[in-house]
Amino acid sequence: MGNRSRTEIVSSILDAANGGTTKTKIMYIAFLSYNQLNEYLSILIENNLLEYLDGTKTFKTTEKGLNYLKMHNEIGELLQQTTMDNNN
C-alpha cells in the first residue's frame, strides 16, 4: 500500500468505527500505528466526526462522520467513473 492521503485515512477510520469498535480494531483495519491513530482520533473527535463511548470503551462514527463517508465515497465513485470515461 502506497502513501495515502489524509482523507483516505480519515475515511478508513470512520468506516472501521461505523457501528462502534475498539481502538485496537480501528488501528488494524485502518493500518495505522498507535501514535498515528491517536493523532487522528483526537482530530475526528474534536470535529464531531467520531465519538468515544465511555460505557463500552469504544469509538463510534457520528452522523456527521457518516455524512463525510457518504460524500467521500460519492466523490471517489465520480472520479473513478471520470477516469474510466477518459480511458475509453
Where are these regions (language model features)?
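Short alpha-helical segments that sit at the start of domains
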Residues: M1-S11
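A short, conserved structural fragment
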Residues: I45-D54
